[in-house]
Every structure is written in C-alpha cells, then in structure tokens.
Amino acid sequence: MLILRGAPALSEFRVNKILARCQQSQLPVTNVYAEYAHFADLTSPLSSAEQTKLEKLLTYGPTIAEHTPAGKLVLVTPRPGTISPWASKATDIAHNCGLKQVHRVERGIAYYVEGELNAEQLLQVTALLHDRMTEATHSQFEDAAQLFRSDAPRQMSSVDILSGGREALAIANVEQGFALADDEIDYLVENFIKLGRNPNDIELFMFAQANSEHCRHKIFNADWTIDGEEQPKSLFKMIKNTFEKNPENVLSAYKDNAAVMKGSKAGRFFPNTQGEYAYHQEDIEILMKVETHNHPTAIAPFSGAATGSGGEIRDEGATGRGSKPKAGLVGFTVSNLRIPGYEQPWESDFGKPGRIVTALDIMTEGPLGGAAFNNEFGRPNLLGYFRTYEEQVTSHNGLEVRGYHKPIMLAGGLGNIRTDHVQKGEIPVGAKLIALGGPAMNIGLGGGAASSMASGQSNEDLDFASVQRENPEMERRCQEVIDKCWQLGDENPIAFIHDVGAGGLSNAFPELVNDGGRGGKFQLRDIPNDEPGMAPHEIWCNESQERYVLAVGVEDFDRFEAICKRERAQYAVIGEATAEPHLTVADSHFDNNPVDLPLDVLLGKAPKMHRDVTSKQVVGKALDVTNINVADAAQRLLRLPTIAEKTFLITIGDRSVTGLVARDQMVGPWQVPVANCAVTAATYDTYHGEAMSLGERTPAALLNYAASARLAVAESLTNIACANIGSLENIKLSANWMAAAGHPGEDAGLYEAVKAIGEELCPALGLTIPVGKDSMSMKTTWKDEGDSQEKSVTSPLSLIITAFGRVDDVRKTVTPQLRTDKGETSLILVDLGAGKNRMGASSLAQVYKQLGDITPDVDSPELLKGFYNAMQVLVADSKLLAYHDRSDGGLFTTVAEMAFAGHTGVTVDINGLTGNDIEALYNEELGAVIQVANSDLDAVNAVLKDHGLATISHIIGTLNSDDAIVFNRGKNTVLSNTRTELRTMWAETTYQMQARRDNPECAKQEFDAKFDVKDPGLNVKLNFDLNEDIAAPYIATGAKPPMAILREQGVNSHLEMAAAFNRAGFAAIDVHMSDILEGRLSLEQFKGLVACGGFSYGDVLGAGEGWAKSILFNDMAREQFQSFFHREDTFSLGVCNGCQMLSTLKELIPGTEHWPRFVTNKSERFEARFSLVEIQENPSVFFNGMAGSRMPIAVSHGEGHAEFANDNAVKAALDSGTVAVKFVDNYGNPTTQYPANPNGSPEGITGITSTDGRATVMMPHPERVFRAVANSWHPDEWREDSPWMRMFRNARKNVG
C-alpha cells in the first residue's frame, strides 16, 4: 500500500465549526488541522515517473496553507470492506491515465486534534469527526491497509423448522428483523414443510422484503371492518375508483414504476443513429412519480434523502421500456427545529430516542442530500414544501404528542416517454437477465422491512444497516444507457426493465420475471460485488443503489453491450428467463442453490390482511384569540418554518439544467422563492410543456381526517391553477399517504380520508389518482435511560398530493410577483371559504400552541371547479398580472409574499370580509389573491360571475408607493409595517440555517442585502438587437459546420448545449470521451469543440480536473487535443464543468497564461442562482459585439471560484484584456459580494478567453437560457430568443 499525503481538507470556517461543536460538548480542543490522505493498492510497483503522475493526479482542489501537523491523529477513512464511490471514480481516472497497476486508490482525512484530551474525550471528538454509517477511524496510517482486505465469502444459514417448527422461525423473525406477520410465519412454515426442507436465510430475507408493507402495500390492499361493519372496498380500490370514473388521458396506471399521462406533440431532441443531434416530431408523453424515504432520512439524513431522490429517479427511468426523468421535487415534514439561539415560543422539547437525529439535523443534512443527488444526476429540482409540527394536543386519541420524529421525506418528479414504449414488452424465454449499474455492497440490508416498522420496533444496528448509500454519477451513466436504448425507437433492445430498490436484487429480479410471465435461473457469483466476504443473502438482498434489472433478447444483446461500454456503465448478465415460473439462484462458490422456489410461494399467495378497527371522535376546543395581538401573530407566522423563506432549501439545488425550465421557485427580478408551481417546456421547439404542484394540510387531520385529505387535493389545484392547463382532465394526481397504522383511531381515519377523495371529491372534480405511495409506520417510540415509561411521538395522518398537468403555453404561467409597471391595478380575494373563517389546525393555532376545533374544508366541489375553470380562462386571456393561493398564514401571508416578490408596498382593506381582524387575516380557507389591471376589472368580474364566484370575490386593495404593507378595516389601521421589516423577519429562518450550515460570512451578506430598499432587481442593458439572427445568412447556405458536443462520464448539460449550437446552424455531434480514447472519433473532423457542464467523474480529484488529467496523462488524447487547440481554424468553449476542465488543460491551449483555476465556492456550497453578468471588452469569438451588455444568466456550480496565484495575477488577467464576463450587482457594478457573486471570485471574474479569442471558458450556463422562456425572469418584450443566443450565432458567423 502506497500512502500519499494530500492537500489541506478544511477551510478556516469549517475548522471553526468543529471547534464550536467541541466547545458545546465541553471538550478541551484548542485546534484542529485536517488534510487528505491517499492510499493506493498496487498490483506491481510504480516507476518514479508513474509515481509522479499519480501524485499529480492526487493534487487537486483550492490552495489552502499547509501546516506541520501537530496533535493526536484521527484518521477517517471509508468503512473497511467497502469501496467508496470516490475510489471507483478515482481508480477509473488513474486507469484512463495509463496507471493500470493501481488496483484501487482510496481517500481518507487525517485530523490532527490539539488539546489536553483524555482517552474518553478523544473518543468523543472522534465521534464528531466521522459518520459511523459510512466511515471508520484509525489512530495510525498503516491501519488503512484494512481498506484493501478481501474476506472469504461467508456461507448461508437456514432456519430449522422441520424440527424446531413455527417457534424457530418466530425467533429468527425477531433476531433478523424480517418484520413477518404471524400469518406470514404460518404461511412460510406450511409451504416449506410441503417442499420438505428448511428455508435458507436468503429465502426468508427475500420473502420478507418482497412481502413487506413497503413493497406489497398490505394495508392498502386489506379487507376492512370498521366499528363492527364490513367495508365494501379496500383502500386501493377506492383510489382506483378515480381511474374507473375518469380514465381520460391516462396511458398507464397502477402497474409500473410510474404512471403515464397524455402529453404534447413536438420535436424531441436527441442524437440520430449517426450521432448528430436532431429534432424528432412525436408525442412526448408525461410520466409522474412521487416516493417517500422517511425511515432512512431519520437515521442518516444526507444519504436517506439522497437515495430517496435516486430511487425515485430510477423509478422514472425504468417506466415502460425506458424513459427520461426530467424535473424533480422534494419535500420535508419534521418536528420543531429549535435552532440554538433562535428557539421560537411554540417550540417545546418533548425528547427523542438516541437512534434518530434531530429535526434540525434532518433539515441541515437531508436537503443537501436530495439536492446533491439531483444536481449530480442532472435533474432540476423545481418544487417543494417544508413543514414543521410537534405539539401536545387533544386529538382523536386524547392528549398526546403529535409530530414528525419520523419525518416525511418526499421525492418525486416528472419525465417523458415515447408512446410506443409506455407498455413493457414480453420477456422471451432465454432472454438475458441483466443487472445494470453499481456493484453489490453490504448496505441497505433489510430496508423495505425496516421502513415498514414503527421507529423503535427494530434494534439500532438493523436501523443503521437499512440505510443505503448514493452514487449519482453512476446512475447518470445508467440513464445514458437507457436514453440511448429508447432513442432507437423500434430497435430499443430493452424488453423489460425495473429499478432496484427495497429488497435489492431479491425483489427486483423476481418482480421482473414474474411481471413478464416468466421464471428465472440466476448465478449469484455473476453479480458485480465489491465485498466478496458477504454471505449469499447479503449479496442477493442488499440495497446498493444505482442499479436496474433488465431483460434483453439474445439477438439484441450485442447492441445493448456496445451502448454500455461507450457510456462506461457497469453491467452483468446474471441469469436467463425460463418458461417455468420458478426461481433458482445458484452459487458456484459453494456449489449449491441458495434459492430454489416456485414464484407463487414468493409472490403469489401470501395471506391477505384484514383490518378490524374502531373509529374515534375528536372534541376540539375553539381557538382562543383573546390574548393574541395581530402584530405579534404576524411576526410569529413569518418565523414559522412552514411559512418562512425557503432560500436555504432552494439555492443548493440546480434549477436550470436541461434548459427546459420555464418556472422555478424563484420569482421576478428580486428572485423571491414564492412560485405556486413548477413548469417545464416539453422540448426546445415548442411552448407546450408540463406543470406540477403540491398540496398538503397535514395538521388538519388532527381534527378532521377527511377534510385534511380534501384540502390537500384542493390546494394542489389552487397552486397549479396559475399555469395554462385548460380542462381538469389534463391534470392527474399522485397521492402519498403516511399514517401510524395501529394507533388508536388512525386506521379508521385513514379509511375515511381515502374514501373522501377516492369515492367522493376526485370523481366529482373529474380527477384521477393513477399513482401514489404509502408509509404506514409513522410513529416513534422510546424509553429514556433510567426511565421505565415509554414515550412516543405520533405523526398526524398525512396526505401529500402532487398535481401534474399538460401545459398548453408555458409563457402564460402567472407568478405571485405584484407588478408595479402596469398602471392602476387592484387586488381581488377569491374566498372559497365563503366567509366561514374556520381556524382549526391553522398556522396561527400552531404558533400559539393550540389546535382549535373546526378546520377549513371543501364545502362545494362545484365551487372549487368553478374557481379553477375561471382562473384558466383568465390565464389563457392574459388577464392576471399576479396570482397567489391562500394557504398557511392566511390572507396576510399571501399578500406579504406577493409584495416581497414585487418589491412594493400594498394597502389592503378587510372591511368587506367577515369575522374579526384575526380571523380575516389569518384564516386558511381555500382561495387566492389576484392582481388585475383596473382597465380589465369589468372583464375579470364577468368571468368570476360566469363561474359562480361573484359573491365570494372581494376587491381588497391596491399597491402603494410607501413601501409599506398595510391592512386596514375601513379607516382603522389593523396592521402596518414596512415591507423591509416583514421581508427580513421572513428571511430569518433561512439566514439562521445558512449561517449554521454554510460559510456564515456569506449568509450574513445575503441577509444584509435584503435591507436594501432601493435594490432595482435584475435588469437588462443590451448593446445589440437580440432579435437579429446574424447567423441566418450562413444557415441559408445549407452548410452545417461540425461541432463536437464533448462529454465525459457524469456530464449532464450536453443536450441543451447541442440545442443551442443546432439553432445557430451547426451540426452538433455527440462525442463521448470514450469515442476519442478508443479511436472511434477524431477531433480532426471538427471546427468547434464545446466541453459541457455537469459532474465528470462526480467531481472526484477536483471539479473538471479528473477529466482534464485523463487527457493530460494519456499520450494519444493529449496529442489530439493539443493539435486541435493549435489549429488556427478551430474554436472552443468550456462551460461550468467544461470550464474547469479546459482551465486545467491550459498548458495545451495557446494564449491562456492568464487563466485561473476554478475551485470551491467561497460559501463552500453548491450555488444555483440566476445572476447578473456584464460582458467585458474582449477578443472572444463568442462575444463579438456584446461588450457592455448586462443580462442575467443561470449559475449552477460548487467549484466556480476563480483562483489566481495572487493579486498581481488578477491584475495581469484584467490588463491582458482576456477577462470576458464579470458578475455585477443590480446596480451594474462588478462585485465580490454574495450572492450577486455566488462563488466569491475576485473582481467578479467568471469568464475568460485566450489572447486570440478562439478558446473561451465561463462558469455560468448560457446554453440553459438561450430561449427567453428558460429564464427565471426576463423583460416582457423578449420574444423567442434570449440575448445569450447571440453567443452561439457569433460562433457560426465566425466560421463563415
């Protein structure tokens, strides 16, 4: 083992955070220094030249001053016996650089801890420095050799039921966490006695996963008796009733990994069989899926949320015969945050068990995990919600603590699929059964069964064993394979595909062959395996991520294999399909068959559940408002996390990748996160698209189960009504149900809620629920040490509805931004509560530690339908200037958020509304506030009247020029604050979370910027005509210069880049680095080259650096690239990851001596922003005629800080005239202030060119915003093109 010292691993503020945690734990630590340590396992010794090459490979990241280490060593490495995702990618890079003797390279962090610490205190510090789920600690470097040990395979065991009977299996059930019900134990004993043998542990694990509540949804399929009366339908049948009543536009429901609805016809953009990107006119259907990943997120929030998103993405990709995930959503419900130093008056501490983390930890790490996976995979995350609730209340079961110690972690999204791929094909006998994706590792074992238990029923080791790990770059490679398959149309080699989720291969392969009407013979040792010491059940049942199972016909296999090799996606043929429905898993190592079962024993005839339950009634207590002050209530509500600003959850997630995002969360020139819904364009040549929104009112279930469900459905509609969708038939719903099954009253309540929407509301509205998910163990129980009394926190019955819709014109989406540039306007409240003002389970009740008695409800489905249809008429006719639904926090919050987005004052008169001031301002009845031009008032009122809304529509106010938010009742002022006062209160939660999680200096700068009353917001200044197509004369010649759209494994922004160059008149050619390294393509044939954005090699060895070094240290590749850059008829562009890559290649590129390196952002966080930049005077072929222009652009990167050697180097770059693009503030001044400069680069530098202008690199993404509609905000006068299209047309003009 070769040990190589690496660069410092922690910045100053990261060290300070560790020291602060040590001080909180009263540990006498005076200093901590950390640096990376690399460990190389070699098959033969390296020459001195090879070792130098390896050392250069392992030199990466920002320049931080090195120290001479002092103090006690705590070496943190990946857990021995595992291969980390970092190692697999770093090893790939080493091999691509010719270092074949490197069997594996791993990375650790060497912490040097100073201070007078005894052994116990050092152990406590060690616990703070590592994650026991994925890491191990050592006291000396030599111990890292354990990383490369290879254990002998362990044998399977069996449970002796032939002699021990039922009792033997019952004991094993508890010890191994199978979560088998009593009748399932009986069923297994009976069947194995029939087979005349004992069950192997692998068979029991497999059965437990395949038949867990998580996988088989036993409660939703159960028969029900409530209060002694048999019920006519199961829960699932009531959901299916919505489809039976309204099947229109549903192409697939209930039978696949995701549901599919009718989409739009447009030009799908992807490479043809010759590799040139082109439009393919076809129906682009919409697929939808929403999952939850609650149990793992309570144990390990980052990995739990990351793998939740990853599993949902795989569900989408594995729909039909392969499809394309497009846009994501994420949501969290947790108990009270109790941010230290920022605790709120309603946040009581009811304790928690030691095995789960705090709500604050979940909301610190969980969103980062979900965002990181989506970012690296390349899916924009455009929608979400965040709710906190934890309170002792009197509900259906009397006085008890209700909250979310077991959190809700929601992961979902939409995608697209070809019509002829919606239905899975037949699996031919003899078809190859393939595992696509990563290797088996001993992680996530028993996840399906563990998540099916109430938290506290399994032991702590099993809880930790049930959490999976994430490798999104691997999943991206797999998706590229799936994409290349579906793009072949009729020649698609995939006959059948499933994702690998709960239960691992032991669930996925049986499901695959069973659904395809076949059986299967499998070879256990053909499964790619990074932990050879695993026992058979661990190999077969582990939940290693980023895997799919597929059936490919023998005649199609060569084509499939070639695609996998080009994309460098790991695959293995594990078995073949058989005509007999039997499952055999052979083990060549031990020469036995660990699994040998008829499929119907595993999947077919397990006992059906029967639920015999009793309903309970709640007697609420009316909300006591006698001591509630209107102003105090407003301040509390703005600090309730459910209502407070969500920027800390949003800017960590890429919202522009694909270049198809038409509406993200951030609204208007001030980028305020208040959007009602998310909207995407179907493709680059159309305005058709897709929308999705969320609806949830979970606390209402504490008073009225059915009303809570109805409110969730209704809120999803009031959120999506601002998009141009048309008929309700164009909307389909996903329903995600969470309940504490078995808790008194909750089962009957669940039945009541499902019936309310499945049998009643959705059929009345014409809505269908073709997809959903349930999680039935939402209760946490524990005993404190030394206390025999059991404690518990039980979640309210929770329904999260996601609405998906086909959009006719994505340009017509209305946002909450109040418009100050449209003349005289009025605000109208449409009150679907019709003046009832019911306050039960409201946010106001929560912040005063009450519950209330009567909740809002959907009293009239017809009125709700009328509201939706009226909004659709007004949206289609462009009569609405702004729209925002009323929800948490009531009218006050709705109006305040609209004012924040519009950067304006507003005056509201509630004189025409019923109820007292508190009820009028803070009730959460359904409805919306719309802004309309006074010149359109008559037309708008006529539409409202035509839809039965006249009597519940009230003109409530208008804008003011005082920058104040004022609520009056007649001549009396009820509430008055400056907009800035309320805006900064609303921002406090996000500031507190950012300051704790990220660089506190950056967090403070962002918070302080919100006090700037005169901030003009994003603005545009152009020195050219953006509608002039300067490439048109060249396109008219018919010549299409070949443009290499270059990508490496993990790159994810190549499609939008190709679309931009295609529009400019180039022949955009798909070029993978493997094409160059293996000689399939040469750069000699191209005039232009663009290195695209993404996460090449998952940013291992530095962002873009691994990609660059695979060129620099590969003689053939180095020669090709150097030759290309030196040809005077070529030009090149690097964007984001491509910018980082080309800047590392600068020794090959003439005239780039002033180029910086691009390293970790100053915030040390991935930054997704819509930032203002200015083009500088520079020689770049891309920016000809654009100097002095100022316009916004998408930014999405974690390592974009331009690092120069020193201040003199910065000055030299500026003096050279090669700086091309700078970040500027909203006043037009170059800036280093965060977040206007999201990475902290000196002088705002974010783009630079070579001295001759032929090579240009920039961190922001022009290719994602070349269409006007893809900009988060743009001036009304922009038509189809944004100003960034000029860049690509300049390149075409340059070629001539």
From Swiss-Prot:
Monomer. InterPro entries: Class_I_gatase-like, FGAR-AT_N, FGAR-AT_PurM_N-like, PurL_large, PurL_linker, PurM-like_C_dom, PurM-like_C_sf, PurM-like_N_sf. It comes from Pseudoalteromonas translucida (strain TAC 125). It catalyses: N(2)-formyl-N(1)-(5-phospho-beta-D-ribosyl)glycinamide + L-glutamine + ATP + H2O = 2-formamido-N(1)-(5-O-phospho-beta-D-ribosyl)acetamidine + L-glutamate + ADP + phosphate + H(+). Pathway: Purine metabolism; IMP biosynthesis via de novo pathway; 5-amino-1-(5-phospho-D-ribosyl)imidazole from N(2)-formyl-N(1)-(5-phospho-D-ribosyl)glycinamide: step 1/2. It is found in: Cytoplasm. It comes from the Bacteria. SMART domains: GATase_5 (SM01211). Its main location: cytoplasm. CDD domains: GATase1_FGAR_AT, PurL_repeat1, PurL_repeat2. Residues 300-325, 1232-1253 are annotated as: Disordered. GO terms for biological process: 'de novo' IMP biosynthetic process. In the N-terminal section; belongs to the FGAMS family. The lineage of its organism: Bacteria, Pseudomonadati, Pseudomonadota, Gammaproteobacteria, Alteromonadales. PROSITE patterns: GATASE_TYPE_1. Keywords: ATP-binding, Cytoplasm, Glutamine amidotransferase, Ligase, Magnesium, Metal-binding, Nucleotide-binding, Purine biosynthesis. GO terms for molecular function: ATP binding; metal ion binding; phosphoribosylformylglycinamidine synthase activity. Its EC number is 6.3.5.3. The keyword Metal-binding applies. The active site is at C1136 (nucleophile), H1261, E1263. This is Phosphoribosylformylglycinamidine synthase. The gene is purL. ATP binds at G304, A305, A306, T307, G308, S309, G310, G311, E312, I313, R314, D315, A675, S887. Phosphoribosylformylglycinamidine synthase involved in the purines biosynthetic pathway. Catalyzes the ATP-dependent conversion of formylglycinamide ribonucleotide (FGAR) and glutamine to yield formylglycinamidine ribonucleotide (FGAM) and glutamate.
